Amino acid sequence: MLFAVICTDKPNSLDLRMATRPAHLTYLETVDVKGAGPFLDASGNPNGSLVIIEAADQAEAQAIAGRDPYAMAGLFASIEVRPWKWLIKNPETK
């Protein structure tokens, strides 16, 4: 099942995000990520994340989100994990 992990950074946390980024990217290579990328502020700086993951259920998806180095470093003001259905341009349905 697919889940959207929607994260909002704490204010003034760009330095923490950039310092933690290498570990975050390495971690994402270890889980079943279908797509990911940052949200951007008006200046083009990252201020949140969207990660689409595959997991067996909500509990597993939340555990995956909680083990992300960004989450463990305290970067996020909020983390929302929601079931997601990929309808448009899903490469697995072609």
Which residues fall in each region the model found?
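Conserved, structured core segments of small domains
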Residues: 1-94
